[in-house]
From Swiss-Prot:
Keyword rRNA-binding recorded: yes
Assembly and binders: Part of the 30S ribosomal subunit. Forms a bridge to the 50S subunit in the 70S ribosome, contacting the 23S rRNA.
Name of this chain's protein: Small ribosomal subunit protein uS15
Entry similarity comment: Belongs to the universal ribosomal protein uS15 family.
Organism annotation: Leuconostoc citreum (strain KM20)
Classification via InterPro entries: Ribosomal_uS15, Ribosomal_uS15_bac-type, uS15_NS1_RNA-bd_sf
Top-rank lineage group of the source organism: Bacteria
CDD domains: Ribosomal_S15p_S13e
Function: One of the primary rRNA binding proteins, it binds directly to 16S rRNA where it helps nucleate assembly of the platform of the 30S subunit by binding and bridging several RNA helices of the 16S rRNA. Forms an intersubunit bridge (bridge B4) with the 23S rRNA of the 50S subunit in the ribosome.
Pfam families xref list: Ribosomal_S15
Keywords: Ribonucleoprotein, Ribosomal protein, RNA-binding, rRNA-binding
Disulfide bonds: none
Amino acid sequence: MALTQERKNEIIKEYARHEGDTGSAEVQIAVLTADINELNVHMAAHKHDFHSQRGLMKKIGSRRNLLRYLRNTDIQRYRELIQRLGLRR
């Protein structure tokens, strides 16, 4: 259910702004998006898993806050990121 370390490292390499970047908003949003997508698949098969549902809602809230931060600080990076991730904003 959780992302494997290899998959997480791939995402970090793809969205990092510089070498060793693991904490930028883009990387955090990309990792959360991958987690959210996996949890959505899990929730489709396990509709009554309320503990996972709560975790999904917390991850969505965290991603929303990071997206808001990025939009307010650098609108161009925000637009590029949502296009790359395929988010509906």
